[in-house]
């Protein structure tokens, strides 16, 4: 699409140059013909030449003269071109007589970029009449991105127009009028809408559906009160006026009643109308101009934000950082999330025996970063940030070579000349450009720091394993203690249930409060149950004397004792 637009623009410029050249040729031919016509004596040869020149002049007059005024001086330069010969002028005029091309390109939005096209002796165009020399102005209504190509035949018919968007209003011959300036009230108040100056009058013609009236600003109240609209000989409030027009169900007189095609809400937004509050007690709201009360204006309700409402600004999230190792053959990427988790996407090796040249580029973000290049690194590793600035313990038992379980030795490459540490999205500095040399003391310090870092990592892993083992042991102990507790509780419940069963009354089954003093094996809840059960229990108890229950003496008559005695 861009290629076609640029081609159209180039074609338009070429055609505009051709049109200008043809116009210049026509003017030169006309001037030559007039100078030759002034000579009184002509020979036969000169007569033939004059006929040819007059014919060329007639052909030239049929050519449409085009004058193009461009906003930029670099588009066209016609002042330094030399005039062609009469023969070339006649040939160009004859070739140009059929079709005239008018090209307008690079139309800007300013008022100075106006292209004026003059059409001479053209017939009527469809919808327009061009008589004599008519100026056609194409102004700001054209699109600023596309070129305009207009092909006009000499018979006056428009053949083709491409890349031209029709203006909102029809184009009329003659100079364009400048845009009308804003009214003084609009410039000062800064209204949102373009109003007629009559909007500031005290009386405004309003309409609701097909009923018209006159709104008096001085009598405007809250809408429900204050009869400010006069229709005929009657006065109505805005709500009554919209109800009379059949819009009572809308309950929004600010949008039902219109002035100049716009609802009254637009006038209220621009501050031209100021309705009163519902609690206003002024003379207009009370429909009594003899009263005088305070005026309370209507204040639009603004929605308040809740306290627990989330803020509109997005919360900045910490993006995961990538540590990419770029060796000669493969690449390994470590992703460090904001929570501290580390994930890898390949194999990693640390060649502790060989000394290689590496370039380390450490970048915190694409916008800012520190570059360390040209360092001699013997061991490649990642230093944990938590150990910076703290003394490291010395472990004499560790050897120079160590193995890490998560990375098998067989799957790891061993010779990688370059190691690059970077973060998302990409490096800003190429890793192959050395910028600063590091002294051997710094390199040895880095080696010691790396060795201590690996020792610290191994110690931390061992401590984590020990902690996990201890946690597992404590878990088993807690589980056993819980099971023992449940067994003890179950046994205590069974014992309590057994005791309750033993202490129940043998007669009624209720909870026993006393027992037999003779055998201490039978329990009773009351003396009534004891007397009732005595007939059966006396054979088991084996006592014929009186029975005492809880220090209560039971006296039995002698006759009964004699009968019961065995």
Swiss-Prot record:
Biological source species: Mus musculus (Mouse)
GO CC entries: cytoplasm; fibrillar center; nucleoplasm; nucleus; RNA polymerase II transcription regulator complex
List the transmembrane segments. none
| Residues found modified as Phosphoserine | 177, 444, 449
Keyword check for Transcription regulation: yes
Q: What happens when the gene is disrupted?
A: Exencephaly and skeletal abnormalities in the rib cage and cervical vertebrae but no presphenoid bone or cranial nerve defects. DEAF1 homozygous mice neonates die 100% of the time and DEAF1 heterozygous mice survived in a 2:1 ratio.
Q: Does the keyword Cytoplasm apply?
A: yes
Task: Tell me a GO biological process for this protein.
Answer: regulation of transcription by RNA polymerase II
One GO MF term, please?
A: zinc ion binding
Relate the assembly described in the record.
Homodimer. Isoform 1 and isoform 2 may form a heterodimer. May interact with the corepressors NCOR1 and NCRO2. Identified in a complex with XRCC5 and XRCC6. Interacts (via the SAND domain) with the DNA-PK complex subunit XRCC6; the interaction is direct with XRCC6 and may be inhibited by DNA-binding. Interacts with LMO4; LMO4 blocks export from nucleus. Interacts with LMO2 and CLIM2.
Instruction: Fetch the Pfam families from UniProt.
Output: SAND, zf-MYND
In this UniProt entry, the residues modified to Phosphothreonine are: 172, 180, 433
Q: In which tissues is it expressed?
A: Ubiquitously expressed during embryogenesis, with higher expression in regions of the central nervous system, dorsal root ganglia, submandibular gland, epidermis and breast. In 12-week-old NOD mice, expression of isoform 2 is sevenfold higher in lymph node stromal elements than in T-cells and tenfold higher than in B-cells.
**Source taxonomy lineage?**
Eukaryota, Metazoa, Chordata, Craniata, Vertebrata
Q: Output this protein's name.
A: Deformed epidermal autoregulatory factor 1 homolog
Q: What gene does the UniProt entry assign to this protein?
A: Deaf1
């Amino acid at each position: 699409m861009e290629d076609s637009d640029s081609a159209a623009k180039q074609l338009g410029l070429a055609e505009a140059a051709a049109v200008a050249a043809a116009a210049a040729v026509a003017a030169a031919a006309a001037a030559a013909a007039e100078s030759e016509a002034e000579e009184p004596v002509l020979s036969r040869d000169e007569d033939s030449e004059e006929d040819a020149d007059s014919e060329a002049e007639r052909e030239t007059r049929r050519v449409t003269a085009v004058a193009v005024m461009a906003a930029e001086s670099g588009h066209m330069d016609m002042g330094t071109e030399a005039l062609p010969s009469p023969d070339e002028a006649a040939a160009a005029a004859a070739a140009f007589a059929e079709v005239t091309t008018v090209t307008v390109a690079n139309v800007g939005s300013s008022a100075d970029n106006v292209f004026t096209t003059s059409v001479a002796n053209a017939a009527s165009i469809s919808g327009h009449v061009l008589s004599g020399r008519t100026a056609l102005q194409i102004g700001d209504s054209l699109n600023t991105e596309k070129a305009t190509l207009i092909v006009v035949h000499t018979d006056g018919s428009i053949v083709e127009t491409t890349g031209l968007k029709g203006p909102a209003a029809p184009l009329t011959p003659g100079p364009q009028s400048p845009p009308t300036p804003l009214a003084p009230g609009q410039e000062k108040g800064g209204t949102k809408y373009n109003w007629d100056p009559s909007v500031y009058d005290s009386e405004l013609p309003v309409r609701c559906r097909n009923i018209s009236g006159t709104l008096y600003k001085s009598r405007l109240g809250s809408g429900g009160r204050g009869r400010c609209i006069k229709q005929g000989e009657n006065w109505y409030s805005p709500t009554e006026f919209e109800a009379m027009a059949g819009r009572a169900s809308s309950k929004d007189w600010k949008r039902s009643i219109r002035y100049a095609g716009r609802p009254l809400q637009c006038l209220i937004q621009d501050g031209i109308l100021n309705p009163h509050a519902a609690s206003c007690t002024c003379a207009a709201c009370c429909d009594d101009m003899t009263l005088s009360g305070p005026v309370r204006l209507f204040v639009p309700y603004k929605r308040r934000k809740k306290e627990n409402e989330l803020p509109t600004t997005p919360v900045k999230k910490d993006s995961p950082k990538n540590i990419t190792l770029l060796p000669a053959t493969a690449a390994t990427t470590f992703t460090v999330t904001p929570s501290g988790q580390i994930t890898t996407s390949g194999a990693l090796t640390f060649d502790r025996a060989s000394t290689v040249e590496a370039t380390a580029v450490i970048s915190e973000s694409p916008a800012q970063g520190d570059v360390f290049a040209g360092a001699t690194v013997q061991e490649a590793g990642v230093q944990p940030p938590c150990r910076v600035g703290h003394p490291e313990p010395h472990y004499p038992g560790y050897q120079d070579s160590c193995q890490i379980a998560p990375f098998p030795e067989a799957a790891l490459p061993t010779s990688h000349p370059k190691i690059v540490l970077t973060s998302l999205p990409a490096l800003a500095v190429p890793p192959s450009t050395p910028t600063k040399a590091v002294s051997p003391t710094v390199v040895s310090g880095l080696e010691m720091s790396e060795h201590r870092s690996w020792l610290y990592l191994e110690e931390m892993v061992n401590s984590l394993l020990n902690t996990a083992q201890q946690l597992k042991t404590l878990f088993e102990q807690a589980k056993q203690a819980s099971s023992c507790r449940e067994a003890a509780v179950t046994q205590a419940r069974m014992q309590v249930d057994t005791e309750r069963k033993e202490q129940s009354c043998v007669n009624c089954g209720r909870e026993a409060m006393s027992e037999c003093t003779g055998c201490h094996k039978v329990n009773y809840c009351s003396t009534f149950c004891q007397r009732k059960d005595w007939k059966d229990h006396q054979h088991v108890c084996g006592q014929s004397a009186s029975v005492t229950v809880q220090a209560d003496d039971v006296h039995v008559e002698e006759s009964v004792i004699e009968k019961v005695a065995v």
